[in-house]
């Protein structure tokens, strides 16, 4: 389990990589982090251990484009997502509507961490 801060994810991911390197397991083909903070901490750990595996994040935070390598990530329109969430909450409370599946589009922002 990796903590969702850059510092904690760095430490946790570094520990994970050290165990992976010491063991006989093969290195994964790629890593996908649940958010950009975890991915950025993982990038630092991989750099220190000379591990070169593609990694992606999620959220497209501003730091993602400034890291080295710059982070490939998934961008979600958070403003739209918030608007839809508020609208659905109001509808749910006022009309007692059933659960509705809503799909929100995303965009892959390809940067250097997957090259």
Feature annotation, model-predicted:
Residues 1-24:
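Structural motif
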Residues 18-115:
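Flexible loop/turn connectors
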């Amino acid at each position: 389990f990796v903590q969702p801060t850059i510092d904690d994810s760095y430490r946790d991911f570094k520990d994970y990589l050290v165990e992976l390197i010491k063991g006989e397991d093969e290195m994964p083909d790629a890593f996908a982090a649940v958010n950009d903070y975890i991915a950025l901490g993982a990038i630092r750990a991989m750099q220190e251990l000379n591990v070169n595996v593609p990694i992606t994040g999620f959220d497209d935070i501003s730091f993602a484009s400034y890291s080295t390598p710059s982070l490939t990530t998934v961008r979600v329109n958070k403003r739209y997502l918030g608007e839809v969430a508020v609208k659905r909450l109001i509808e749910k409370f006022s009309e007692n509507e059933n659960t509705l599946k809503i799909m929100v589009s995303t965009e892959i922002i390809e940067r250097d961490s997957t090259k």
